[in-house]
Curated annotation (Swiss-Prot):
Keywords: 2Fe-2S, Iron, Iron-sulfur, Metal-binding. The lineage of its organism: Bacteria, Thermotogati, Thermotogota, Thermotogae, Thermotogales. Its cofactor is [2Fe-2S] cluster. The keyword Iron-sulfur applies. Transmembrane segments: none annotated. GO terms for molecular function: 2 iron, 2 sulfur cluster binding; metal ion binding. [2Fe-2S] cluster binds at residues 6, 11, 39, 43. It comes from Thermotoga maritima (strain ATCC 43589 / DSM 3109 / JCM 10099 / NBRC 100826 / MSB8). This is Protein TM_1420. Not very thermostable. Binds 1 [2Fe-2S] cluster. Disulfide bonds: none annotated. Pfam families: 2Fe-2S_thioredx (PF01257). Might be part of a multi-protein complex, possibly involved in metal cluster assembly.
Length: 75
C-alpha cells in the first residue's frame, strides 16, 4: 500500500504535518509506504491523502487510522 500526503500550501496550513506524523506512527502497525506529495488539486477539501490511487479529503490525525482500515477492508 502506498500513502501520499499532500504537502501543498493549503494542506500544510490545514495540518498536513500532523497527518504525516500520525501516518508515521501507523506504519508500525500497518505495512505501507509513506510519501509527501505535491498538490492534488482539491485544496478546499484538505488535508488530502491518496492511498493506492484513491483520494481522501479532510484527513486528520484522528481519522487517519479509520481511513486506512477502510482501504484495507475494501481493497
Amino acid at each position: 500500500m502506498i500513502v501520499r500526503v499532500c504537502m501543498g500550501s493549503s494542506c500544510h496550513l490545514k495540518g498536513s504535518y500532523e497527518v504525516v506524523r500520525r501516518f508515521q506512527e501507523l506504519q508500525k502497525k500497518y505495512n505501507f509506504k509513506l510519501y509527501g506529495s505535491l498538490c492534488f488539486g482539491n485544496c478546499s477539501q484538505g488535508v488530502c491523502v491518496e492511498i493506492d490511487g484513491r483520494l481522501f479529503s479532510r484527513v486528520t490525525p484522528e481519522n487517519a487510522e479509520e481511513i486506512l482500515k477502510k482501504v484495507l477492508q475494501n481493497g
